[in-house]
Amino acid sequence: MNTVRVTFLLVFVLAVSLGQTDKDENRMEMQEKTEQGKSYLDFAENLLLQKLEELEAKLLEEDSEESRNSRQKRCIGEGVPCDENDPRCCSGLVCLKPTLHGIWYKSYYCYKK
């Protein structure tokens, strides 16, 4: 019976002492994994940032192309009254005071340049 107690006590002491080293090793492994995880997260963050910048550049490029190719909107055609201070005549037209017809309206009209 005494040998069983001694054996149990010996196994208990060994388990506790080896368990402590395992705990320290586990803690060190966890620290290494978190450091690796941080570096992986930094890498993933940089990769995502690059993709977002590329996407933003493409979107800005499409916007600039669209504005270059879009036609002029809400402009006043030839022979239509316009405001002298805020002419909205289409391209190729100028807001001028009429020479012959329309002088009694005291208004400006869009004419070709």
Swiss-Prot record:
The keyword Transcription regulation does not apply. Its main location: secreted. InterPro entries: Toxin_22. It is found in: Secreted. Pfam families: Toxin_22 (PF08092). Expressed by the venom gland. One of its GO terms (molecular function) is toxin activity. Residues 1-21 form the signal peptide. Residues 22-74 form a propeptide. Disulfide bonds join 75-90, 82-95, 89-110. One of its GO terms (cellular component) is extracellular region. Keywords: Disulfide bond, Ion channel impairing toxin, Knottin, Secreted, Signal, Toxin. The keyword Secreted applies. It comes from the Eukaryota. Probable ion channel inhibitor. The presence of a 'disulfide through disulfide knot' structurally defines this protein as a knottin. This is U11-theraphotoxin-Hhn1a. It comes from Cyriopagopus hainanus.
